[in-house]
Amino acid sequence: GYYVDFVPQGLDATQTQALQGFFAYDRATWEAYRKMDGDLSAVEASTTGTALESYRKNYKKAQDAGEHEVGTARMTVTSVEMQSDSEAIIDVCADQTQIKRVTSSGEEIPRSHGLHTYSDLVSVKLTDGAWKVASFEKKGKDIC
């Protein structure tokens, strides 16, 4: 499953649209890693720049290894700060403690880095009329 545990109150229309763009990205990337069917159209529609390049690379690595993910993804949004009319920085915490990486036969693949929560600052930009995730700045793990 995919759950959003918290979103800040009092967002204006532009902040809300930027946040919806982030959620489109986050849900699309999670579904793509669960299905691993090669269809990245929803990811490509919600992602641009270095974030898209990085996702394609990591997806291909998992696809080549025959891996996919199962479990529950949880997201908390701390803030949505507009940088301009066409860019927002969204402070998020992704709880990946209930996500497992498995082989095509369903065997769990141990993660060398364990299961954690990840805190990121996400740049979302208005691109071709849609809010798309452009880049990430990692703040840390297990701090949210």
Predicted features, each with a name:
Residues 38-144:
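Structured, amphipathic secondary-structure segments that form assembly/contact surfaces
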Residues 1-68:
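Core segments of small alpha/beta cavity-forming domains
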